[in-house]
Amino acid sequence: MTYKQRNTNQLAIDLITLSRFNRYNPLLATFSGVWATILAGSHKITHSPNSVTSEYVLSQALLCFICSFVFCGAGMVWNDWIDLHIDRQVARTKGRPLARGAVTTSEALVWMAFQFISSWVLVSWMLEGENVQAAMLPVTLSTILYPFAKRPIFRRLHIYPQYLLGFTLAYPSLIGTLAIKPEGNAQPLWASINQSLPMFVTVFTWTLYLNTAYSYQDVVDDQKMNVNSAYVLAGSYIHHLLVVLAVLVLGAVGWQLYGQESQWLWGGWMGVWTWSFLGQLVRFDKSRPESGGPLHKENFALGVWTVFVCVVELLIGGNGC
């Protein structure tokens, strides 16, 4: 009994590790939805003060956080299963539970299915059964395709895995927008898509930036295996690529904030991100691929900071001053 109990406990630990729940990475998948929910709620409170409460907005943001977190866990399992033969050859990934044989394929797939179904149920609850397929199917498809985009065949199509990852992490901005229903509940889906577009572009470009820097740590092994990736293509121009991506991110943030008309957001979001990006680009060293790791962590901190900025914007009633 003791031996079986020890195995059960170890399996639970390995499954948590498989979904990266022991690390901060899945939290990156929660930012776009949480930001979008809070800012949509802030906008609604500003223009219709009695239509919704801050408590309701924050409860919807929490649901969006949980949905995104759990869905990301399922995506991590799928990625490791498809990339199993690659992970076993890369120094940074060969210790993952599937790669080292700590979790069987059957166990991993059951765990993945449980997380996916849970996230679908939570999204349905949050959206009160409306637009659930529109919220879940596109991001599910991009998650399925993501690991395959690392194959050389996708290079011929000029499709890189960062594109699909960016789409996957940015798409919850639509879910967050849908979570705050407009007055009269009459807004069509296309209008919600249009409303969420600036946030989508912000998170999409931000993901390209931070993932390119982070994944550059594997550039030596990936070049040997001819892995399809933007940082492999960039080669010695990796620093130039990061500068271009940083400019695109800040431009997208400006687009998002232009519609918010908030001095607080301009200072707390745009100001802090601009200063941070300048420091990151100075510290990144293409001759030391490992320098991309700290940059990735700093961007996670920016994501957490921006949640705080959005919450303050909500609590001050969207006045931004």
Curated annotation (Swiss-Prot):
Its EC number is 2.5.1.-. Chevalone E derivatives produced by this cluster are interesting candidates for cancer therapy since they synergistically enhance the cytotoxicity of doxorubicin (DOX) in both MDA-MB-231 and MCF-7 breast cancer cell lines. The chain crosses the membrane at residues 26-46, 57-77, 107-127, 132-149, 159-179, 189-209, 232-252, 262-282, 300-320. One of its GO terms (molecular function) is transferase activity, transferring alkyl or aryl (other than methyl) groups. Pathway: Secondary metabolite biosynthesis; terpenoid biosynthesis. Keywords: Membrane, Transferase, Transmembrane, Transmembrane helix. Polyprenyl transferase; part of the cluster A that mediates the biosynthesis of chevalone E and its oxidized derivatives that possess a unique five-membered lactone ring and can synergistically enhance the cytotoxicity of doxorubicin (DOX) in breast cancer cells. Belongs to the UbiA prenyltransferase family. This is Polyprenyl transferase cle5. It comes from Aspergillus versicolor.
